[in-house]
Design a protein with these regions (language model features):
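N-terminal helical cap/lid subdomain that shapes the substrate entry/recognition surface
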Residues: 2-93, 101, 114
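Conserved Lys-Pro-Asp/Glu-containing loop-to-beta segment of HAD-superfamily phosphomonoesterases
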Residues: 6, 143-171
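Conserved H-loop
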Residues: 36, 125-130, 157
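Surface-exposed amphipathic alpha-helices with a cationic face
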Residues: 92-99, 171-175
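A short, structured active-site edge motif that brings together acidic residues
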Residues: 126-141
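Acidic, Mg2+-coordinating phosphoryl-transfer loop and its flanking beta/alpha structural elements
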Residues: 163-203
Length: 216
């Protein structure tokens, strides 16, 4: 796959297991706003989609209440949640190898950009990325728009860019942005190749090491 110049990674469920921090962000927001409990499946469904969509769907919030709950979520994320994450086994080594092979590396995440930057710095991998693009407080960006920002910063076009991600949101974002998609099944979204194959893709990786083999 030497045609690629820029490899863009999703964060949650692709680069790192961020579930503990995300779940604790939700619990903090629930406590602060006295929200009812939700099921484990509903909790897990918060990983991947835009934050406001998850709170709208699972807690039926809107307007000022929605803004308040997102504020509490972000409050926990920036003070504690960003430290409650761990890189998937082999990912740090993969990023180092890809960088040495001359790829430009980027992150496109619906997580708040400040949180993502601080988290990846804490995990000691921020230095591998040319750009980290995430959600902004005053601007709602779709996955495809974030991918466009990454490509623009890295000076690459659609034909030379690839997104690695673990969910249908990633696959649809790549399709909308006009770039290739590599699905992974070790994260929170896809669980097998059949699910990945429901979307246009150039491959499916069950482990981090398989990403490296596919890109070699």
């Amino acid at each position: 796959m030497s045609k690629y110049k820029t490899i863009i990674f999703d964060l949650d469920g692709t680069l790192a297991d961020t579930s503990e921090g995300i779940y604790n962000c939700i619990r903090h927001a629930q406590k602060m706003m006295n929200l009812p409990p939700i099921t484990d499946a509903q909790m897990r469904s918060h990983i991947g989609p835009p934050m406001h969509e998850s709170y709208e769907r699972n807690f039926h919030l809107s307007g000022q209440d929605l803004e308040k709950v997102i504020g509490y979520h972000k409050e926990y994320a920036l003070t504690k949640g960003l430290f409650e994450a761990s890189m998937y086994e082999g990912m740090s080594e993969l990023l180092s190898q890809l960088k040495q092979r001359g790829y430009k590396l980027a992150v496109a995440t619906l997580k708040y950009e400040e949180t993502a930057q601080r988290m990846l710095t804490f995990l000691n991998v921020a230095q591998y990325f040319d750009v980290i693009c995430g959600a902004l407080a005053d601007v709602k960006l779709s996955k495809s728009q974030l991918l466009g920002k990454c490509m623009s910063f890295c000076g690459s076009d659609e034909a030379s860019s690839l997104l690695v991600g673990d969910s249908s949101y990633d696959a649809l974002g790549a399709k909308e942005a006009g770039i290739d998609f590599l699905g992974v099944t070790y994260g929170f979204g896809f669980t097998n190749q059949q699910e990945v194959d429901e979307f246009p893709n150039v491959g499916c990786a069950e482990t981090v090491n398989e990403i490296g083999r596919i890109l070699s």
